[in-house]
């Protein structure tokens, strides 16, 4: 799921795959050909997170910016 937070909505490249059971929140940029697995949480609620082209975030990983 993609969630807006404090006026920031994640930007996801068309060629990226975000699993329906993943959570992407706030100030997040997901590049091309990126894979976000089930249970992953990418929380850009207090700062920007950039997942660059070709990267992957595997199952149940958390990426959080304070």
Which sequence ranges carry the predicted segments?
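A detector for short, charged/polar N-terminal pre-domain segments
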Residues: 2-9
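A structural motif detector for beta-strand N-caps
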Residues: 10, 15-18, 22, 28, ...
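Extracellular beta-strand-rich solenoid/capping regions of secreted or surface-exposed proteins
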Residues: 44, 65-66
């Amino acid at each position: 799921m993609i969630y807006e937070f404090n006026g920031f909505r994640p930007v996801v490249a068309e060629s990226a795959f975000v699993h329906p059971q993943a959570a992407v929140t706030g100030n997040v940029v997901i590049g091309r050909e990126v894979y976000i697995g089930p249970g992953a949480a990418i929380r850009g609620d207090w700062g920007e997170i950039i997942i660059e082209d070709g990267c992957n975030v595997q199952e149940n990983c958390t990426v959080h910016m304070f």
